[in-house]
Amino acid sequence: NHITKGQNSTLARALRLIKEDKNRNAKYLMHQADFIVANLLNKGGLSDENNTLKLGYDLKKNDWPEWIHRTGFKKYLLPKVYPVGAHLGKLNEVIANELGLNKKTNIYAGTTDGNAGFLASSKFKIGSAVTSLGSTLTVKVLSEIQIEDSNIGLYSHKLGKYWLVGGASNTGGNVLEKYFSKNQIINLSKEINPNNSSGLEYYPLANIGERFPENNPERKPQLIPRPKDETLFLHGLLEGMAKIEKKSYEAIHQLGGSFPDHIITVGGGSKNLVWEKIRMRIIKTKISSGINIEAAVGAAKIPFLFGN
């Protein structure tokens, strides 16, 4: 029951890289954040609990699981893992001179861009919820307990003494862009009455396959019947995505998390106020757009929230 299950997981991609390294020239396996840290410290082989989660790191044992070596991993490739906010060292003097930075600058273990976005846009308290409406739809809820179920694509990141529970659906802006231009979406949205139902029961996907709230690579899009009225079609798509969002939060709630009384929205879809009203009607909770939505803002908060 681990998030590494599946051919598109980080673990699967890492195994492919290892297979391609036929001469075994690699010394470390790195995420992008690890690569940046290695350059700032002039020392590789370090990572954080969030970036390594989908690679297989065991948050309960605070160690790499035994089974990971049976997949083909060599122990020397796996990074030493630190909690988010752990002090990793001082900025390398050579790098400090090159970048014009203070040589006393501290380097801390970071997080994923999605988690940093959550920290940027939401208050760090139990029950805080953020939906990201980008090319895909991602939901995250801060919880006191770890919640995970690989059967539906649900997992938890560790942030301090709490857990950031979430999952990502394949629905989202990529579906809208398949049928409409950005200007069409803006103009047609103005013609939609968000208080009324479209009467359409859609499961909007751009392609076959879903990750969350059901982990089903064979899941087919449900976009029938297709009305001739483009406004009605868009209405149905927006409602379908709102229903997937609701189902996502319900799945977290059923497994012990909080159902949000307020959802912060980030991403391009947060600008569509008609969609926001449709979501409020269907999910039956308060929804508003995030003020600080840049992941860099969340990353800057890490030393103050979790630093040691």
Residue ranges and their predicted role:
Residues 45-51:
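Helix-loop-beta segment of a Rossmann-like dinucleotide-binding subdomain
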Residues 60, 84-87:
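Short beta-strand to alpha-helix junction loop
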Residues 1-4, 9-32, 37-43, 54-72, ...:
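Active-site core segments that coordinate phosphate-bearing ligands/cofactors
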